[in-house]
Amino acid sequence: MKFGIIKERKNPPDRRVVFSPKKLQEFQKQFPETSIVVESSNIRVFSDDAYAKAGFQITEDLSDCDVLIGVKEVPIEALISNKKYFFFSHTIKKQPYNRDLLKAILEKNITLYDHEVITDTRGNRLIGFGRYAGLVGAYNGFRALGRKEQTFSLPKAENLADLPALIDQLNTIKLPAIKILLTGSGKVAKGAKEILDAMNIRTVSISDYLTTSFNEPVYCKIDVLDYNKRIDGQVLTNSDFYNNPSAYVSNFMRFARVTDYFIAGHFFGEGSPYLFTREDAKSDHFNIHLVADVSCDIDGPVASTLRASTIADPIYGYDPETSAEVAYTTPNAITVMAVDNLPCELPKDASDGFGDLFL
């Protein structure tokens, strides 16, 4: 069987790849009966030369491959009929903007293996970039804090070589005594937690977070039953929340009263209560002034996220009084970082990690 590593063609350019040269060598060693070629790319984080030196043929023609492996959606005009493809199609949730892509896949007799639905026996996703979204999202939040307050300056993550370089930059800054709230329990939240821990920011209990003032920056990581409560007052399990979200209301405002920087790393399920609404954000008791919305659900559970932002222009402001977008420098505006393709800013690490998961 012949495998081809495809060139990423989506715009804006995505430098990630499923297999680094080293990981592709492991693939070849693990499955010696396979043949592997790499489509030439001038944007990939690993150069054509790096793959050639690792022993792989570089080609412009993948028509004789049986299986083609990529990261993001393949443009319709680049799809090759009668092939097996691995990539994120962004069609699983019936996204209307990719309806034509799905139709083309069917018309061209393509077998699609979507990374998003490759799971274990319990239904847990095996492949994804959540960790890297959390890592970069937390970093970008601190970068936004420095820009908003004009107290320190951090380079864009995309201009740094790798994760250690990113952490080195964070450890050059001095933070005020802020309270940082992190929601979630999955890969995204764990990635953000890695950043907070690498900065030696102390983690505190919910009780202390809500009631105690500190003379240093601290953070608290919370899950669904911490920021939601049953309407009838019962305290049950996470499973009950997932199965009966309509039986719950948000209990997030107790955290919003004391939080300075909020990192949204949770998964928001359909029918779940919004964490905070536009009316909540207008309250005198709403203290959050910076949101890194890694989850990036537009006009939904995090009211200040009006739109996704971009790597080129990652932050904007949200005016609680008008519920409108303003410049992030506007007094009293909530600063919002809502980039929806964060792993692209850490392409080398994300690619290395992707290959580990894939094999």
Regions picked out by a protein language model, each given a short descriptive name:
Residues V67-E149:
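Phosphate/diphosphate ligand-binding glycine-rich loop within oxidoreductases
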Residues K10-S41, S153-V258:
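Glycine-rich phosphate/diphosphate-binding loop of Rossmann-like nucleotide-binding domains
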Residues S81-E116, Y261-T322:
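ADP-ribose/adenylate-binding Rossmann-like module
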Residues R9, S40-I43, E73, V117-D120, ...:
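Short, ordered loop/turn segments at secondary-structure junctions
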Residues A50-D64, I222-F286, V339:
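A structured beta-alpha segment of the ubiquitous adenosine-cofactor-binding alpha/beta core
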Residues T111, E116-D168, L290, S295-L359:
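Adenosine-phosphate binding glycine-rich loop
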Residues K2-A104:
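An N-terminal-biased, well-structured beta-alpha scaffold segment characteristic
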